[in-house]
Design a protein with these regions (language model features):
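ABC-type nucleotide-binding domain
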Residues: 1-258
Length: 258
């Protein structure tokens, strides 16, 4: 998958992406990070063809996605978004929606890979458990695992994780991240992330700022460069440490939660 010198604007007088150029090799994981408004989510919308590019091209296996029907393109890509949409039906139905013709064994195997099978099996009604409107009967982490299982079952050529863990607490995020690492192994994967701790194992990290790629490389390389990525990393590590200290103080009774 490749973005070739892509430019894009939602409005004619305000360009969002400026010459974005990168390749995600088959079976590798590329992460895109950057501040809010940098254009990260725009990249996922373009890949899914909610919008077409103004200049340049997006290709999959060398073919311009503008020459592919939206139906076949979206069959090629499996997305796990930040806000998972679940139907007011059973857990089984919500997973099987990824590929309705799948067998029960395939649905349960997808759930195992997403690390939700044991939880579902422990419920009185198991896979027949109703999730409620928009999945309100499940926690945020459980909903994301259902979404991951659904995407695994779909067996897409490309995986897209669009801020898939950003709305979760730190502990749940770590657990979900372990699932994502397992699922994305040897698959062509694009990860759009806010928390840098979730993408340190990526083969390549792209740092997007004001619609331009300003840095690229592996996690260790970007830290050595001591540029935009390194500053973002330090800020997030300091914030995480402060949060941990505060939680410890509350647990020790030195502070009371407000």
């Amino acid at each position: 998958m490749a973005f070739r010198n892509v430019t894009f604007s939602y409005e004619t007088n305000r360009r969002i992406l400026h010459g974005v150029d990168f390749i995600v090799p088959a079976g590798k994981t590329t992460a895109i990070v950057g501040p809010s408004g940098a254009g990260k989510s725009t990249i996922s919308r373009i890949l899914f063809r909610f919008y077409d590019v103004d200049g340049g091209a997006v290709t999959i296996d060398g073919q311009d996605i503008r020459d592919i029907t939206q139906k076949s393109l979206r069959a090629t890509i499996g997305i796990v978004p930040q806000d998972t949409v679940l139907f007011n039906d059973s857990i089984y139905y919500n997973i099987a929606y990824g590929r309705p013709a799948a067998s029960r064994e395939e649905v349960e195997e997808a759930a195992r890979l997403a690390r939700i099978h044991d939880f579902v099996s422990s419920l009185p009604e198991g896979y027949d458990t109703k999730v409620g409107e928009r999945g309100l009967k499940l926690s945020g982490g459980e909903k994301q695992r259902v979404a991951i299982a659904r995407t695994i079952l779909k067996k897409p050529d490309i995986l897209l994780f669009d801020e898939a863990t950003s709305a979760l607490d730190s502990q749940t995020e770590r657990e979900i991240q372990a699932s994502l690492r397992e699922v994305s192994a040897n698959r062509t994967t694009l990860v759009i992330a806010h928390r840098l701790s979730t993408i340190i194992d990526s083969d390549e990290i792209l740092v997007l700022e004001a619609g331009r790629i300003v840095e690229r490389g592996a996690h260790s390389e970007l830290l050595e460069t001591d540029g935009v990525y390194a500053k973002m990393w330090r800020r997030q590590q300091e914030a995480a440490e402060a949060e941990k200290t505060l939680a410890g103080a509350i647990a020790d009774g030195a502070l009371r939660p407000t």
